[in-house]
Amino acid sequence: MARIAGVNVPNHQHTVIGLTAIYGIGRPRSQKICDTAGVPTTKKVKDLDDNELEKLRDEIAKFIVEGDLRRELSMNIKRLMDLGCYRGMRHRKGLPCRGQRTRTNARTRKGPRKAAQSLKK
C-alpha cells in the first residue's frame, strides 16, 4: 500500500478513487491533483512508480488534509461556541444550526429518544 499524507491508500483502486481515502480529498480534488501531477487517473495505485508517488505527495502537500483539516474544523466550531453566537449555542446544545425544525425529526443531531418522564406527586 502506498502511504500518502499519513494514510495507506488502497492498492487495488484507480489513483483517482484511491486518493479519496485521504480526509479532505474528494473526487473533483483528486482529479485535479492527478492532472497537475501528470499521473494517469486510470492507473492503479500499485502500478505507480516512486516518481509519480512523489509528485502526488507534493501536490497533496499544497492542501489542508487529514489531521490539520479536522483540527481547523473543530477550532472553527469552538470559536463559534466561545463567541456565544446563535450557531455556537446550537452546537453547544447539540441541535441543528441551519434552521431545521426540531419539534419532530432532528433525531440524528439530538440522539436517540429519551423515555417520557412520569410525574411524581
UniProtKB/Swiss-Prot annotation:
Which terms does the record give in the GO molecular function aspect? rRNA binding; structural constituent of ribosome; tRNA binding
Entry-linked NCBIfam families: uS13_bact
Cite a GO CC annotation: cytosol
Q: What is the recorded name of this protein?
A: Small ribosomal subunit protein uS13
Ribonucleoprotein recorded as keyword: yes
Q: Write out the entry's keywords from A to Z.
A: Ribonucleoprotein, Ribosomal protein, RNA-binding, rRNA-binding, tRNA-binding
Give the residue spans that cross the bilayer.
none
Choose any GO biological process term that the UniProt entry carries and state it. Answer: translation
Give the gene that encodes this protein: rpsM
- A Pfam family matched in the record: Ribosomal_S13
User: Which cysteine pairs are joined by S-S bonds?
Assistant: none
Region feature (Disordered): 92-121
Q: What does this protein do?
A: Located at the top of the head of the 30S subunit, it contacts several helices of the 16S rRNA. In the 70S ribosome it contacts the 23S rRNA (bridge B1a) and protein L5 of the 50S subunit (bridge B1b), connecting the 2 subunits; these bridges are implicated in subunit movement. Contacts the tRNAs in the A and P-sites.
- The reply to whether Ribonucleoprotein figures as a keyword in the UniProt entry is yes
Alphabetized InterPro entries for the sequence: Rbsml_uS13_C, Ribosomal_uS13, Ribosomal_uS13-like_H2TH, Ribosomal_uS13_bac-type, Ribosomal_uS13_CS
Question: So which residues are the signal peptide here?
Answer: none
Subunit and interaction comment: Part of the 30S ribosomal subunit. Forms a loose heterodimer with protein S19. Forms two bridges to the 50S subunit in the 70S ribosome.
Family assignment from sequence similarity: Belongs to the universal ribosomal protein uS13 family.
